[in-house]
Amino acid sequence: MKNLILMIQFFTRIPINIEIDVKEDSFAKGISYLPLVGLIIGGFNAIVYFVSSKFILGTLPIVLALLANTIITGAFHIDGLADTCDGIFSSRKKERMLEIMKDSRVGTNGAIAIVFDFMLRYAVLNSLNKKYIIIALILSPVVAKTVVTLLMCFSVYARKEGGLGGVFVGKVKPFRVIVAFIISISIGYVLIGYKYVALLLITVLFIEIYKKLIYSKIDGMTGDTLGAANEIAEIIFMLALLSFKGCGLL
């Protein structure tokens, strides 16, 4: 339970004022609970959408749900996406890319990434009916948090010095990833059945491609690239869900 609380405190802005004795391996042990953290985030976003759609017509409830996601996560992962795009697409050497990613200022590539992140989410959600908007809002953070555990476990840390990503990358044991996937599949099966597994695997495939791109640039993962992976995974899952719905598979 302490590790779950630690993960909620780390990945969300939910005010849980409980002091936890954090050890060096506490974060790595807690990743098994990341799908549950995703469920909390997704559940909050879905509630905001559902309640607001009862009183507001049109697409504004979708915008409010996206705003809710930004608030509950503190824009934690989208900041990583912006930093990653600024660094990776800077056409510099590895060391300079890592320096750029560490810069708190948002560059052109980062700004474009943020805009397209929200545009893609909005476009996909606006293409779904109310039922599947709620499903997408709930499950996309669950899938993303699940898939990112693979990067934490089977990657090396790109920076020589420490950083937020360093408490996860290369520190996670495989069985904790297995537990995370079991929890994730259990959640997804309740909502959309066995087809969740197919959507999860599609997301894994695209994140593996993303990993190869990052490795070709900086030879490893950082906290920023993990955050970017989370954002990309959510969008990939939403796009896959929309495709399945369009093809009559859901």
Curated annotation (Swiss-Prot):
It is a multi-pass membrane protein. One of its GO terms (molecular function) is adenosylcobinamide-GDP ribazoletransferase activity. It comes from the Bacteria. The keyword Chaperone does not apply. It is found in: Cell membrane. InterPro entries: CobS. It catalyses: alpha-ribazole + adenosylcob(III)inamide-GDP = adenosylcob(III)alamin + GMP + H(+); alpha-ribazole 5'-phosphate + adenosylcob(III)inamide-GDP = adenosylcob(III)alamin 5'-phosphate + GMP + H(+). The chain crosses the membrane at residues 31-51, 55-75, 106-126, 133-153, 187-207, 230-250. Its EC number is 2.7.8.26. It is an enzyme of class 2 (transferase). Keywords: Cell membrane, Cobalamin biosynthesis, Magnesium, Membrane, Transferase, Transmembrane, Transmembrane helix. GO terms for biological process: cobalamin biosynthetic process. Its cofactor is Mg(2+). Belongs to the CobS family. PANTHER family: ADENOSYLCOBINAMIDE-GDP RIBAZOLETRANSFERASE (PTHR34148:SF1). Joins adenosylcobinamide-GDP and alpha-ribazole to generate adenosylcobalamin (Ado-cobalamin). Also synthesizes adenosylcobalamin 5'-phosphate from adenosylcobinamide-GDP and alpha-ribazole 5'-phosphate. This is Adenosylcobinamide-GDP ribazoletransferase. It comes from Clostridium novyi (strain NT).
